[in-house]
Amino acid sequence: MTKQVEIFTDGSCLGNPGPGGYGAILRYKQHEKTFSAGYYLTTNNRMELMAAIVALEALTSPCEVTLSTDSQYVRQGITQWIHNWKKRGWKTADRKPVRNVDLWQRLDLAIQSHTIQWEWVKGHAGHPENERCDELARQGANSPTLDDTGYNPD
């Protein structure tokens, strides 16, 4: 039987661009694991993507995943926009390079072996897991230790 996993994610950025962090919670039955990191210079969207990527990459076998995010950018990007981006060679409808393509490609790879239900939750609205992820993300942003090597301030 396929494992049923819940993932909750959030990203934060102080300045946008600026110091940023992500937080994620991975829950399987009664087990829970949290993920968090901070970057010296990044964007909010990159941190939202990283939260989902890191949690999904932690899964070691195919799972049925419910992934909750407060980022419409992540949810719409992975459920709607990515298909055409890939058809166009990672270009937008107006033929410009997709922003954050390094992370979109990594997320695309991370989802391949899983069945994922992408759920949007309103941020800062009292959703307990989203609030915890927000706290983890802000902690990361407030004490960065990593360079976001893929960040391109074009």
From Swiss-Prot:
GO terms for molecular function: magnesium ion binding; nucleic acid binding; RNA-DNA hybrid ribonuclease activity. The keyword RNA-binding does not apply. Signal peptide: none annotated. Mg(2+) 2 binds at residues 10, 134. It is found in: Cytoplasm. Monomer. This is Ribonuclease HI. It comes from Yersinia pestis. The gene is rnhA.
